[in-house]
């Protein structure tokens, strides 16, 4: 009886872990996207995922007008290497059974605590951090091609860092340029 109870608790905990990871990603994506129009979001998603905006708008409709679900679907499509129509079919199946995105992970044999689970969780975590930066940059520039590129934003575009000593020299030049610009502004 104890083994049965333990197995039941473990199963419920597993489903909860899947749901929490997916729900957090979707919730945060919806918070990010809630500030912008569909055209802007489709432009950002197009830039990040490389999916045409017209296709993204279809996905938006398919996933219940929820940009968070679209992003998670695209992420899981990449993680599992399956086409988006299949992702949507599995998602729809899970939603109709009240299970949501957890069905996807279970179908592909992802068990909580496994190496595959941690890879998936790390991939979603990285994407989540990337999107935080992308929407932060986009709020400043309103240019989807510039947002989240990990560089210095200038009027003429983005200059990416090169790493190491080159970065230090570049940052020194940027500080010098900013100092000179500040001096000119005070005159």
Predicted regions and their residues:
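Basic, mixed-charge low-complexity alpha-helical segments
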Residues: 139, 161, 165-183
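Mature extracellular/secreted ectodomains of secretory-pathway proteins
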Residues: 21-157
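Extracellular lectin-like interaction modules
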Residues: 68, 182-187
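Compositionally biased, low-structure terminal segments
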Residues: 5-7, 19, 136, 155, ...
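N-terminal non-cleavable signal-anchor helices
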Residues: 10-13, 147, 159-160
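Bacterial Sec-dependent N-terminal signal peptides
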Residues: 1-21
């Amino acid at each position: 009886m104890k083994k049965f109870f333990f197995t039941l608790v473990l199963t419920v905990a597993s489903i909860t872990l899947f749901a929490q990871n997916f729900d957090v990603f979707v919730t945060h994506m919806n918070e990010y996207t809630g500030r912008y129009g569909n055209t802007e979001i489709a432009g950002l998603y197009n830039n990040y995922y490389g999916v045409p905006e017209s296709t993204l708008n279809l996905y938006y409709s398919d996933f219940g007008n929820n940009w968070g679900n679209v992003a998670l679907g695209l992420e899981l499509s990449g993680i599992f290497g399956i086409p988006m129509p299949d992702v949507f079919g599995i998602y729809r199946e899970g939603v109709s059974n009240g299970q949501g995105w957890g069905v996807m992970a279970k179908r592909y044999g992802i068990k909580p605590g496994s190496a595959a689970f941690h890879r998936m969780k790390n991939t979603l975590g990285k994407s989540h951090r990337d999107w935080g930066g992308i929407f932060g940059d986009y709020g400043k520039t309103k240019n989807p091609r510039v947002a989240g590129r990990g560089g210095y934003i200038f009027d003429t575009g983005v200059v990416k860092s090169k790493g190491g000593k080159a970065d230090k020299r570049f940052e020194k030049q940027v500080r010098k340029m900013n100092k000179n610009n500040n001096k000119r502004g005070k005159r």
